[in-house]
């Protein structure tokens, strides 16, 4: 059995902790068979190979007496780079328990459990459902709605350094002035409306008007402003900080990608630029 889980990019600017998109970097888990104890083969630095691995931990939260198995894990998703690596591992663990434990979970149940672990749906919901998803907590549960996908390439600038989510969370303000909070909420609301109506000129403007987190985290990702300027010169729709960073995501037409890549090289920015596409289906099992 093979479980494939996409990466994800959260926030899309002002959609803090509520908007996310599944992307074409993949986490693959091959279930090789039962074993006397959990064995997780992988080549990812500083991640455990036994039952303390996040994939196994998550599966055992759903089914505590799950039979140990030998797993082989491969991942294109860089750890601690704002591309949902931990969320993808959590979703892989949920699907592992679902399959081995014959739980027959619905997507809604998977999203609910994943959100309980993560605390918010912006990464886990698109990872499960695929595409672009908007969600929030409602009356103790979680609601998630799929939105139309923007017809753009997601160009991920991935720096060599990482940013731990805990560090990025610590940079956030504990409160916002009421007037600022109203403006931030209105921007996010209008972004959602523009996504559903396909007004992508407005989408591009609103993605770059975040008031919740990007300014507070700018010192952690100093390339953000320069990448946004380079993107504008190359015809990009918008640039935003992916999740907690440090990955910076730029939406642009596929034809504009070579010019954007050349501009980054000319500017001497050392990170990798990776062209990504939305992953339409989310987690799959074969």
UniProtKB/Swiss-Prot annotation:
Coiled coil: none annotated. Signal peptide: none annotated. It is found in: Cytoplasm. Keywords: Amino-acid biosynthesis, ATP-binding, Cytoplasm, Kinase, Nucleotide-binding, Threonine biosynthesis, Transferase. GO terms for biological process: threonine biosynthetic process. One of its GO terms (cellular component) is cytoplasm. ATP binds at residues 78-88. InterPro entries: GHMP_kinase_C_dom, GHMP_kinase_C_sf, GHMP_kinase_N_dom, GHMP_knse_ATP-bd_CS, Homoserine_kinase, Ribosomal_Su5_D2-typ_SF, Ribsml_uS5_D2-typ_fold_subgr. Its main location: cytoplasm. One of its GO terms (molecular function) is ATP binding. It catalyses: L-homoserine + ATP = O-phospho-L-homoserine + ADP + H(+). It comes from the Bacteria. Pathway: Amino-acid biosynthesis; L-threonine biosynthesis; L-threonine from L-aspartate: step 4/5. Its EC number is 2.7.1.39. It is an enzyme of class 2 (transferase). Belongs to the GHMP kinase family. Homoserine kinase subfamily. Catalyzes the ATP-dependent phosphorylation of L-homoserine to L-homoserine phosphate. NCBIfam families: thrB (TIGR00191). This is Homoserine kinase. It comes from Limosilactobacillus fermentum (strain NBRC 3956 / LMG 18251).
